[in-house]
Amino acid sequence: TAEVVDLSDATVTPGMIDAHMHMDYIDWHTIREEVYTTSEEAKTIAIIRTAQKTLSRGFTTVRHPGGITSNGFGVLDVKRAIEKGYITGSRIVAAPRFLCAAGSHGDLSQGFARNPELSNIVQNLRLSLGAGKDFFVNAVREEIKYGADFIKIMATGGFFTPYDNPSQQQMNDEELKAIMDTAHEWGKTVTAHVYSVDHMQKLIKFGIDGMEHCSLMDEETAQMIIDNDVYVVPTFCPYEEAVHYDPVMIQTKQEEYRIKLEYYKDALQAGREVIKNCKCKLGYGTDMVATHQNYESGYEFKAWMESGMGTFRTLHAATKVNSEILQLEDKIGTLEPGKYADIAAWKRDLMTDPYALLDCAFVMKEGVIYPTEKCEELTD
């Protein structure tokens, strides 16, 4: 006999999807130490833990756009183990290693850049870091050979790394074009970490499928994105203290992060307004490497709500739009016959409570009910 679950006192939704989650660390407070001091095996354990915790929070599918701490393919082993039922956890779509250049946002040896000998040792561990068209063509082929679902590139600098900035292009045009052409020849989509509008526009012209962050967006670029059917995963959470300016909280950040948030705050605020008002295809992703634990995906809902995005657009992004970005729209993203029974329920008011997605009351993945956990930081 079928089990009856009474959810009449909750709001029922499809299982949520986080389209930008780096799964390979235990605690955001110690992420830099984990980069350098934990083994690939330990990082794979972190991925398992993250997958279990995200499922318990109502996010039945997550997208991993490259390892922050890891250099290997543990995320693919975890993905396959979940699919085979050996372990429980959110469904994973993964690009195990992002492609990047020396000194770029993806070059985690920057932390040792004042000790070149040690920095070079760490740099050489990141096998998807290199230079030249031929290197990156082969890197794309290797990622696909080992099981990557899509390709991720670090096209510009970022906020969290010490010796680059969001306005820098960090691969040359030939490298960028070669990556996209090769991935498309092999039937894979490409997404890029990118901030500045000139680089967004260049990537669009080269044939990019999607872009992450895009936080310095302008209206001209937004229209190009629409015209070329490119998706954007804007990841609001990492920039909240700058967008909703909070100088006290900014002062608690690490030095290089703090300096960039202050420097770019006006541009981040302007970009947020463009993103909020544009008609681009927006996905829901968190990228919480410096603000909250990676599995607390509900914080992005709070960020969207407090930016005036509206509940329906936010939930649409976290379900149907994300299912399309992950190329799983025939299986997840809506509740309808023929799709997986991925279901979540929420007792807080999704229309008015910005913390609603941090307090999951029920979760089912592929017809199996799992225990839920609410956000560790919620007090009520």
Features from the language model and the residues they span:
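Histidine/acidic residue-rich metal-binding segments in metalloenzymes
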Residues: D77, A131-V232, V248-M249, L261-L282, ...
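His/Asp/Glu-enriched, well-ordered alpha-helical/loop segment
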Residues: V35, E185, T189, T252-E256, ...
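Metal-associated gating/positioning segment near the N- to mid-region
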Residues: A10-K84, A102-G106, E174, L203-F206
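Active-site environment of divalent metal-dependent phosphoester hydrolases
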Residues: H22-D27, I68-F73, C100-A101, S109-Q110, ...
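Histidine-rich, glycine-flanked metal-binding segment
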Residues: T1-T13, E376
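Histidine/acidic-residue-rich catalytic or RNA/ligand-binding cores of hydrolases
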Residues: W28, V75, S104-G106, T161-Y163, ...
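Divalent metal-dependent hydrolysis catalytic cores, especially in the metallo-beta-lactamase
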Residues: I48-G74, T88-F98, A148-T161, T189, ...
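Active-site gating loops and adjacent loop-to-helix segments of metal-dependent hydrolytic enzymes
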Residues: M23-K43, A102-N124, G158-N172, N228-A267
